[in-house]
């Protein structure tokens, strides 16, 4: 039940409904309502006050919701004593405010600069990032009891084998100490569970409430009232938030990587939901039109890659050490992707639901725990493979759908990042994914550059790798001379698709993998080289004359040939292209400049739509069949003469139209089948031209989904702020890449200026009237006809948390931190000294003075103070044990950097002094 009451007013009239509001408007006396039923409830207070000059009166309306009966009785007793109740509420509000501030402070949400809107916006971004993805409960400290509970939930056998080890753990220990103790046990199964363990709290599901997984609940206590560690969310979103969180908690990066790859399937995809309890997937419900299954594979590569890149930056040797370690699992999702031939025959219906497998999985979960949803070996244990295998399988899955000059074929029944493009499924190919794959390939090449010796792979994966490499080798001679022929494109698509299809046939068994085999590393590096050549060729083919890039193309499948046609300009494609690493700094600047002159720029918001706005045809302008086309098809000519309106009919104005019963070409085929007796051989003779005419009239192939027919969310005229913030971060990456490559100063200046021009369009730079909402809060989207919509429900927060730390110049490479303020502006530095309150690594509130010409922020909960001065750049490090020391330049040694990464508390403060000349002008 819900309890509502008030404090601070003497004998007010209390209304439990809105029935007396008109009487109030007429100035009539209101009568207290003690009970109402059958109508919508409310709670209003009415009284008269007399205030002396400069006087004040305060009162409160308090609501407490979802209470059990015993709790209601407690509240009633409390509010019988208004004085005590007021004290309890004031204490609760203060405690809640402090606890929320501690949560945000622990994720580095507090900053102090001369631009208050910037720091307030950063606070909001950090807060919403936590609300979506959660936060680590106690820094790097974990509870042995909670870890043991997690092991027991996941795998009862492993828990029983290691009860003695688990019982011997100290109750509170660091995640590093926990891993070390687990490794001493010598059981890879337990080590896998340790790497998957994420002590996260406070996060709640997010997003569109119409989706079944979004039930907006922050669960902080269990049924017994004990503190609860929990998280859940759509995998496409929660891993984004964990990326930004891991930047402040780098010690957990490899654990997040493990959680990601351990949830991917044998066929290379991730099920739609991830929770502390394990993985989850959509279940097919026959007869339910809203039930749907399939895989989103679009940003799987880039989300994983961003985590891998963080690991290499912070811990340069750690991934290499894990590459060969058999600590990673496969999710066992009861989806079965059809054969290549079946996909070609109907690319929109490609995934079957295996109910027999679903039942077996349920039995295994009941027997062993959540690990029953993973692939098991012949002995009933979780089948574990190396990290390298887990990194190769999603790449091979994408290459199995690679269309040269086109992108990655969207044939797993789900769209890409933009759900509004859902109609692209089946006949769309994604350059977006291909741009990100290029970056992924380069990363793997760098990761393996110093590795030698053979690797262990599952035999079926090794064969898939070899078949894919052979298909890419056959394609190689056709590359580099402009787009390949339609026939060559089909041959390569078929070869790659059949390789993936044979692999799926092999692993869609009760026991998917037969054995592990030793594979020369050269086979892997050869695959990467061949794939990169084909992808670079395709990227060149998709650059437009204006310097922008295609995002998606459309497939046109014919007998023995495959053609691709580009769709219209999309912001998503430009962001992915900028992120690919394929564009030189000067070309990157030209691309962004072209966007400001393009049809996706909205001058009223100083920002970018997802795609160009365009007028839609009216109802009567649709479904118009040219009379000449009707006359040219014998069947239509005969049916029209006979007055048979079952395929086309003529309206009173003489316009021919297809039957209103038809939803798509399948309905046309069904009608033709039904007409066989009446029209005989004319049916088959007219089928192909009729189908062609139907597509010419409706152009269904070009229909992208609600993106081309709606106006809110990701519709026409809409700005989607997450994609704008992705653009911002991509420009920042190109800015720093230009500096690292020693690009000319003019190009660097252009990129920096373009960064701030894009940033200027974000809400926190606008008035409430211009933005249509609270400017400092992140919002999902701004349609063309309204202000910003859906507060906080956006991946924008993750991008902007990272881009903000980039603005401040935090750059990590080779396990060391350096400060690079060349994107920071002088307007952020204060003119007068001010106080800055922050939460330190020991969870204590501290305060420091920010000097004039300074600013302050925290990172890994270490306070960092910047100060502009006329001398050379230098650092002042205040340490817990070593006192104060000064270092020339702006780079920290790896040892000191590691103290910060580990949140050891040794580094208490860093002061960074540098001249104005280093700032962005």
Stretches found by the model and what they are:
Residues 1-921:
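Acidic, mature catalytic/reactive cores of soluble proteins
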